């Protein structure tokens, strides 16, 4: 673990019996108590995640808006100050460089939150595509810690630590300079679990103190520290993509089923021509949800078959703690992608029957 990057909370993991793994070059807890108990805490009460490995990049300057509007697939013109936008950065072939959140302070100041595995790649991509735009791009990832408190009790717990009325921070909005336990933070009503909750950004030096305060206050509400394992099962049930699984440089937003975040009518952006061509010609493959009929747990990379031939592969698969079923997502040949179709997942060299169902396994409980 010595050669892995560590968040400011690393020393605290031991105290909470964190089981550490290598995630994209970071030493992070896959679980504390257990993946299932942490998952259930988030669905029913609250969970606290260390997500300080995520990247933060600021874009400032006279042409910050125009620069980003050309870089991303979603429409920045629909975003008001103190709102957050989910979007993709695509390459010229329409594949996904990354999926990210864009926080808008003003047309000349944006704050981007990107995936940990892609920080350096994204930063380089942005600089390489800066062209003549008058903007300053700064990677501040090493200075910022991030905690996520997620679950139906998240607001009630966090409210105990601040005088700011958190109910005024609406879904996909944020407020800066919010004092939580006396620490100035940026707080957004966002998350990656399908539940209500907040993501909290602060300087590294305050992360341990804030984590401990939230755990202390949250105990009586059933809050539990949660690791990457529960984070993955939660996002998966909610139909949220994971970069490297449902999204990649080779998988487009359209194939992943996220055309909603690709605004073809907004003017030009990188990847638009390729995506438009793909849309007009029709998708050759797409991501579908499936439920196992035979007994077996599907895993990332497992082969998917139909009529004795390979038609794709599993992108994510789990026993769902909420639904108590073995379910998965798979990228398959479009002609087999109709709801209700029977497919086979090859598990330990054995083709097992599965049924194609909606990808929205779990109804999201956001506070709009």
Curated annotation (Swiss-Prot):
<comment type="subunit">
    <text>The glycine cleavage system is composed of four proteins: P, T, L and H.</text>
</comment>
<dbReference type="GO" id="GO:0005829">
    <property type="term" value="C:cytosol"/>
</dbReference>
<keyword id="KW-0032">Aminotransferase</keyword>
<protein>
    <recommendedName>
        <fullName>Aminomethyltransferase</fullName>
        <ecNumber>2.1.2.10</ecNumber>
    </recommendedName>
</protein>
<dbReference type="InterPro" id="IPR013977">
    <property type="entry name" value="GCST_C"/>
</dbReference>
<dbReference type="InterPro" id="IPR028896">
    <property type="entry name" value="GcvT/YgfZ/DmdA"/>
</dbReference>
<dbReference type="InterPro" id="IPR022903">
    <property type="entry name" value="GCS_T_bac"/>
</dbReference>
<dbReference type="GO" id="GO:0005960">
    <property type="term" value="C:glycine cleavage complex"/>
</dbReference>
<keyword id="KW-0808">Transferase</keyword>
<dbReference type="Pfam" id="PF08669">
    <property type="entry name" value="GCV_T_C"/>
</dbReference>
<dbReference type="InterPro" id="IPR029043">
    <property type="entry name" value="GcvT/YgfZ_C"/>
</dbReference>
<dbReference type="GO" id="GO:0019464">
    <property type="term" value="P:glycine decarboxylation via glycine cleavage system"/>
</dbReference>
<dbReference type="InterPro" id="IPR006223">
    <property type="entry name" value="GCS_T"/>
</dbReference>
<comment type="function">
    <text>The glycine cleavage system catalyzes the degradation of glycine.</text>
</comment>
<dbReference type="Pfam" id="PF01571">
    <property type="entry name" value="GCV_T"/>
</dbReference>
<dbReference type="InterPro" id="IPR006222">
    <property type="entry name" value="GCV_T_N"/>
</dbReference>
<dbReference type="GO" id="GO:0004047">
    <property type="term" value="F:aminomethyltransferase activity"/>
</dbReference>
<comment type="similarity">
    <text>Belongs to the GcvT family.</text>
</comment>
<dbReference type="InterPro" id="IPR027266">
    <property type="entry name" value="TrmE/GcvT_dom1"/>
</dbReference>
<dbReference type="GO" id="GO:0008483">
    <property type="term" value="F:transaminase activity"/>
</dbReference>
């Amino acid at each position: 673990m010595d050669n892995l990057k560590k968040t400011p909370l690393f020393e605290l993991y031991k105290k909470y019996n964190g089981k550490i793994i290598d995630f994209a070059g970071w030493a992070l807890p896959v679980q504390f108590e257990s993946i299932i108990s942490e998952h259930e805490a988030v669905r029913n009460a609250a969970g606290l995640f260390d997500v300080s490995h995520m990247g933060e990049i600021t874009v400032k300057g006279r042409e910050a808006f125009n620069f980003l509007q050309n870089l991303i697939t979603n429409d920045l013109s629909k975003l008001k100050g103190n709102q957050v936008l989910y979007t993709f950065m695509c390459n010229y072939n329409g594949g996904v460089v990354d999926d990210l959140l864009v926080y808008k302070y003003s047309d000349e100041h944006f704050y981007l939150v990107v995936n940990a595995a892609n920080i350096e790649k994204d930063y380089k991509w942005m600089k390489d595509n800066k062209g003549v735009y008058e903007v300053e791009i700064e990677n501040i990832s090493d200075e910022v810690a991030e905690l996520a408190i997620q679950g139906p009790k998240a607001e009630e717990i966090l409210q105990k630590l601040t005088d700011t009325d958190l109910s005024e921070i609406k879904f996909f909005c944020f407020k800066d300079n919010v004092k939580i336990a006396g620490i100035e933070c940026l707080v957004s009503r966002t998350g990656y679990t399908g539940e209500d909750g907040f993501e909290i950004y602060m300087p590294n030096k305050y992360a341990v103190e804030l984590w401990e305060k939230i755990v202390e206050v949250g105990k009586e509400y059933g809050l539990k520290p949660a690791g990457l394992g529960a984070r993955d099962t939660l996002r998966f049930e909610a139909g949220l993509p994971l970069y490297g699984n449902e999204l990649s440089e080779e998988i487009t937003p359209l194939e992943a089923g996220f055309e909603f975040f690709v605004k073809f009518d907004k003017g030009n952006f990188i990847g638009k021509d390729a995506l438009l061509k793909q849309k007009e010609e029709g998708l050759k493959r797409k991501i579908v949800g499936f439920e196992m009929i035979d007994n077996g747990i599907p895993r990332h990379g497992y082969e998917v078959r139909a009529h004795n031939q390979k038609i794709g592969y599993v992108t994510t698969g789990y026993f769902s703690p909420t639904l108590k079923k073995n379910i998965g997502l798979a990228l398959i040949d479009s002609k087999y992608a109709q709801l209700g179709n029977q497919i086979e997942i090859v598990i330990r060299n054995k083709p097992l029957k599965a049924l194609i169902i909606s990808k929205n396994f779990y109804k999201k409980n956001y506070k709009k």
